């Protein structure tokens, strides 16, 4: 405990640390949060970017909250992510939690600029959100792969799945923004990029001319020849079409797919 106390003293006035739980989209968003906290000099917080896909995932959220407070008692804990969005009251009642922030709000720089003056829950109706944020991430610390958000939310209402209530309705990132994001990462030395979202096979339905995921992949591979490997996160097998099978001949598209069943 003496060593832990000394470590805590040394860590005071250090950058806030981010704990990402759950999906690859959270990894991407965690880097966005990290960049916003660094830019606005937000220090001495532990920010837990949570998951709520299963009951076990929610148990892990509570475990991480308590562990973080025990190990770094001087740091205020901010909870965000799907668990925070779906059940903010549950977590704001935990003594260890200083602030609860919703899934859309966590990507809003204005929220982080005023975070030191905030002490109340900041969670709005996620179903009112119709656009994606347009952040550019330069690197993913400690990771060989880079993650690029192409889509948010889900229009399906599967009886077993709570995620639409954490992420809202499906909304897509415009192709030019995706190309810009990938170009930046490739120019910074990343050989592999993972396209991520909540329901990426629904990509483009809300954009002008409704480009689909497979048209996006072709555009990326044709526009960015320096990109060596492109990988997909989870895909809905019900939305796979002939364009998808034709894409498998592309050597730079990794032939490993996680199917949501």
Model-derived segments and spans:
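Proteins enriched for Cys/Gly/acidic motifs involved in redox and nucleic-acid/cofactor modification
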Residues: 3-203, 257
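Conserved SAM/AdoMet-binding glycine-rich loop
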Residues: 77-81, 86-88, 187-261
